[in-house]
Amino acid sequence: MKKHHLLLAVAAAFTLIQTAAGTVFAAAPPSVQDVSRMLRHSDGAVFPIGSYNARNVDHFTGDSYVAPLSKGPVPVANVTFVRGAHTHWHVHHGTSQTLLAVSGRGYYQIDGQPPRQLLPGQSVTIPAGARHWHGAAPGEMFQHIAVMEPVKGAWTQWFEAVDGQEFEALP
């Protein structure tokens, strides 16, 4: 229960992150109801799942959803990664990104470092300019709150997908 209150307090302190989440897929993405059912089997969903975001399908592997948590000067969102979905390698130029794990099991990796697991209640701040990726563990659901300070001139540069064999080899 303390984790729930802490996460609600953190979310209330920030606003929506306009994260680009999507995927290239052969079939329609799962419905919000289907994603809700899947999450109930992996610690449940504390925050809304939001809507499927196909705006940047070229920058994610697998399906993901984005839910705005508040409005204001600092963007904050809950991002739901469906069964192994994850971002491609990318860099946030001019601003850092903080990820707060909410449910399921995920990973992040900063280029040149080993992948690190993210579990509910854990957080990481990715430094500005650090090439990285983040998302669900192979075959598992994952949700995180993403927070980025809005900085004039900040932008995201996208790179290639994470190596599929290396990703699938994660424990």
Residue ranges of model-derived segments:
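Glycine- and acidic-residue-biased ligand/ion/polar-headgroup-sensing regions
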Residues: 94-107, 111-112
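Bacterial N-terminal signal peptides
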Residues: 9-20
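Bacterial N-terminal signal peptides that target proteins for export
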Residues: 1-10
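Histidine-centered catalytic micro-motifs
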Residues: 87-96, 130-136
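Short acidic-glycine-tyrosine-enriched beta hairpin
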Residues: 112-129
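Ligand-binding loop in jelly-roll beta-barrel domains
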Residues: 107, 128-155
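A short, N-terminal "cap"/entry segment at the start of jelly-roll beta-barrel domains
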Residues: 25-75, 88, 155-171
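Conserved short histidine dyad/triad with adjacent acidic residue
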Residues: 75-92
